[in-house]
Amino acid sequence: TKDIKALIDVGISYTKIKKALKEIDVNISEITHVFITHEHSDHIKGLKMLLKHHSPKVYLTEGTNSYLKLENANIIKALEKVVISDLSVLPIPLSHDAKEAVGFVFEKENKSICYITDTGYIISELISLLENHTLYYLESNYDPFTLLHSKRPYHLKKRIIDEKGHLSNEESAYYFSILKGDKTKYLIHSHISEECNTLKKIKETFDTVLRVQGEGTEFKRYYALPNESTELIIL
């Protein structure tokens, strides 16, 4: 927004974040806020170095901070809205094998972002809070057939499929089909497994589920890939 430049998670190195921000003409020193979903390394890898060089305000749950032990953290609670300048932030409780994982709904005026990743399912009672947002950043972690036939050990397969694991393409597509609304303009597929998923499988699954559910595809689709930046999206 005009007053806030924020990062959601810091899962890559400080150097890579600095480079990616430079591509959109943002200096890393301009980052004012950081929102952390949970403590797993692929979400906090660059946080220590970021805080060594800069002083953004960090928002995270008490459970997550019990692991990170940040002294000046801003503790947030699931389903308790935080208003920061011109931005409203609602932490959403998720089901993941972490201390206290959350997603987020960010709102400013009539534009909103729903950020949901690293969860085994979405709590049904919260669906109404997640409906009809402008942009969805939604986990499409794995294709079930590919995962089950992969060389990954059984315990890892079980962890991923578990209710505290990750969303499959089918699960993600189903949730999106019931969440999207007339305000929805963008979908970013995220947390995509390099070993157990493909962009083709994601697209085919989503197209099929949306067709069966009688939903259209009048939105722009992007894929968040590990070593690539998506194009800049202005809501």
PLM-predicted stretches and their roles:
Residues F219-L235:
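Short, basic/aromatic-enriched C-terminal tail that caps enzymatic domains
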Residues I4, S13-L60, T134:
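Active-site metal-binding motif and surrounding structural segment of the metallo-beta-lactamase
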Residues H40-I44, S66-Y67, A98-K99, I122-S124, ...:
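Active-site environment of divalent metal-dependent phosphoester hydrolases
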Residues S124-A224:
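Cap/insert and terminal regions of metallo-dependent hydrolase folds
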Residues K45-H54, N65, N197-E204:
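Metal-dependent catalytic neighborhoods of phosphoester/phosphodiester hydrolases
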Residues T1-I24, V102-D118, L135:
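Conserved beta-strand hairpin/beta-sheet module of binuclear metal-dependent hydrolase folds
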Residues L7-G11, I31-E39, Y59-E62, C114-T117, ...:
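Active-site neighborhood of phospho(di)ester-bond hydrolases with catalytic His/Asp-centered motifs
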Residues L60-K111:
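Metallo-beta-lactamase
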